[in-house]
């Protein structure tokens, strides 16, 4: 009897974990129109710059690779803010990846932290928020322009490029919805 009860409980538990939300939003849900205006005035230029930077780097290896461990982010309908938060927090995990050029990592972190700031959100892990503190006090003269890292291809870089593309698409979707 006990074993049957035990098995029935633990069959439901994984289902509950799958059905539960990935992360509860830690955003101070602000006025969406204000968020759009802040994005357009403050952040959109940096997002465009980051997309242009990512286009400069080789991506032929990214097109042919299937990423076993990569996270795919979608901009969920009616949950754009939570989607943007999740993407921004995920992008911060690439900040210390040495295989990606320093200037590209810093720009990605700047966009991620800017997104979190505009949305008034926080990441679940405080380590990622420390990156934003580091980025906000960063001296831009310190960045490198490494041609050698442009030639290298690695999974982390491909994942970051996909994340950047998703982030931009989600911001565009958010803008269109709010403009209606």
Residue ranges and their predicted role:
Residues 26-180:
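Extracellular/luminal segments of secreted precursors and ectodomains of membrane proteins
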């Amino acid at each position: 009897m006990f074993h049957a009860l035990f098995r029935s409980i633990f069959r439901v538990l994984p289902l509950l974990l799958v059905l539960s939300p990935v992360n509860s939003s830690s955003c101070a849900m602000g006025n969406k129109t204000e968020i759009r205006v802040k994005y357009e005035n403050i952040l959109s230029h940096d997002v465009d710059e980051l997309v242009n930077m990512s286009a400069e780097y080789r991506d032929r290896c990214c097109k042919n690779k299937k990423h076993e461990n990569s996270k795919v982010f979608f901009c969920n309908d009616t949950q754009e803010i939570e989607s943007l938060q999740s993407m921004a927090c995920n992008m911060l995990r690439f900040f210390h990846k040495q295989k990606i050029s320093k200037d590209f990592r810093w720009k990605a972190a700047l966009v991620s932290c800017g997104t979190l700031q505009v949305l008034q959100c926080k990441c679940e892990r405080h380590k990622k928020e420390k990156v934003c503190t580091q980025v906000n006090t960063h001296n831009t003269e310190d960045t490198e322009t490494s041609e050698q890292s442009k030639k290298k291809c690695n999974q982390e870089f491909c994942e970051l490029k996909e994340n950047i593309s998703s982030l931009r698409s989600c911001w565009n979707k958010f803008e269109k919805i709010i403009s209606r």
